[in-house]
Amino acid sequence: MVEFSHTKKIGSAGRFGSRYGRKIRVRLRDVEIKQNKDYKCPVCAFPKLKRAGTSIWVCEKCGAKIAGGAYTPETGAGKVVTKAIRRVIESKSREI
């Protein structure tokens, strides 16, 4: 019998077979897809920002190291804070 490292529906989480339950394997699949996706470097805009470790992202072109989220370079909360800061800066520049 040949063991497959992935399945059609679950993807790479198929390596666990029927263990741990479907819901957990689907969550794992979603995290692994986000984690291994190529992201754009905020320094040079090259689309090869790779995860080096937990919350550490490195650009393959310019070598910039960025601290971000565990599975994505920018978390949802980080995006909200960035937008809020940008709004404050824009409102202050309008006042001057």
Swiss-Prot record:
The keyword Cell membrane is annotated on this UniProt entry: no
Gene3D superfamilies named in the record: 2.20.25.30
Highest taxon listed in the record's lineage: Archaea
GO biological process, one term: translation
Zinc finger (C4-type): 41-62
Names of the cofactor(s): Zn(2+)
Cofactor note: Binds 1 zinc ion per subunit.
Cystine crosslinks: none
GO CC term (a single one): ribonucleoprotein complex
Entry-linked InterPro entries: Ribosomal_eL37/eL43 (IPR011331), Ribosomal_eL43 (IPR002674), Ribosomal_protein_eL43 (IPR050522), Ribosomal_zn-bd (IPR011332)
Pfam families assigned to the protein according to its UniProt record, in alphabetical order: Ribosomal_L37ae (PF01780)
GO molecular function terms listed in the Swiss-Prot or TrEMBL record: large ribosomal subunit rRNA binding; structural constituent of ribosome; zinc ion binding
Keyword Zinc: yes
Binding site for Zn(2+): C41, C44, C59, C62
PANTHER family reported in the protein's UniProt record: 60S RIBOSOMAL PROTEIN L37A, LARGE RIBOSOMAL SUBUNIT PROTEIN EL43
NCBIfam families assigned: eL43_euk_arch (TIGR00280), PRK03976.1 (NF003058)
Cross-referenced HAMAP family: Ribosomal_eL43
Family: Belongs to the eukaryotic ribosomal protein eL43 family. Putative zinc-binding subfamily.
Quaternary structure and interacting proteins, as annotated: Part of the 50S ribosomal subunit.
Protein name, as recorded: Large ribosomal subunit protein eL43
Organism of origin: Methanococcus maripaludis (strain DSM 14266 / JCM 13030 / NBRC 101832 / S2 / LL)
